[in-house]
Amino acid sequence: MASNWNAHSWRGHEARHLPVYPHADKLQAVETTLTSFPPLVFAGEARALKADLAEAAAGRAFLLQGGDCAESFAEFHPNNIRDTFRVLLQMAVILTFASKQPVIKVGRMAGQFAKPRSSPMERQGDVELPSYLGDNINGMDFTPESRIPDPDRMLRAYSQAAATLNLLRAFATGGYANLRQVHQWTLDHIGKSPWAAKFGEMADRIGEALDFMQACGVNPATVPQLQGTSFYTSHEALLLQYEEAMTRQDSLTGKWYDTSAHMLWIGDRTRFEGSAHVEFLRGVDNPIGVKCGPSLAPDVLLKLLDTLNPGREAGRITLISRYGYDKVEAGLPALVRAVTREGHPVLWSCDPMHGNVIKADNGYKTRPFERILKEVEGFFAVHRAEGTHAGGIHIEMTGRDVTECTGGAVAISEAGLADRYHTHCDPRLNAAQSLELAFLLAEAINLERAGQKAQAA
């Protein structure tokens, strides 16, 4: 266990982006209730994910992490969970075929409610109210009552996360994730898409590989791995009162785990020195993600790694770069070189979403698909140049046909954003854009593999 740590030691550190609850007794009652609830995930599952991520850090696997910007109570529906899960599976099949490596599937699901905001207050006209911080803290409606932090929302978030996890586990192991079925969904989608000619060849090659396996007797009936899949959950560990209440000691190892998710990450705004969020995460044995952007200096990152992973355990740390399409190739190399020089065993993943938010002329927040793709290409270019492994992708997406990010082959225009703009926070890739990104990622992975083969020769 981490030295001088317990589940509430974070309370002695600086905690930014946490709500101020008006009634301390009500908050304490909710925290006590949560500590008596069953864990949402199990320590052994978190250890299995860590082992998988260690393989990715070593260049033998690839991480696909995706889901909602912020889950909401209003959009909680089994069809929404199913559709996002399905698109992640389709992306994983495409990436597995391209990389010839296992793809680790981690959802931003079953707990991704709270969001740090750039300002604690929101102004509409002459009225100023506390900002919306996520459905597990306060309400989105712009009224004084809705914006008051309510501890009972944590109980509802727990219930929704439990139901979401239950459905995800059923989908992952109950036959829905059948490899042949997943590929058929992709074929159906390609047939309706404007990029059928470009990506149809790869889809056909995947189909031929499945036919070959079938002829050899390798099919879902004979190989369980083709019938189901492993699927993990993750969210930003922002609301520390909830995370503390969900922390349990593993009876087998004696280590502490945050059982609200398999993997947790710390954001750009909460990883400063002396942070309560860093203090909490250094003591739980889950895999941890760290967002890395232009404001993070190499020496600060190295100190953070020494704090979060003093034993240099492989699979413990995933560094998620988020620079912006025009900054990644200038900013990321210094971090990669510093981490490589010091020998920290990290997995490098790319978040091409958060550095590429713009405001359209009609007032909608959006992310141009072309900028998202350009940041991914820059991320791969940096790792090719540095001789390191571009090991993952972290995206905000949905399986629904929303119109929140402009561009892509579906050619969503700024004028078209209003058609189906449903996000509670930041704009997400829709199903078609997510699949297009997977095919383009596959091309980048193939380029990386070609470079590795050339070096080996």
Language model features: what each stretch is:
Residues A58, S260, G283-D285, E342-H344, ...:
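Short, well-ordered loop/turn elements at secondary-structure boundaries
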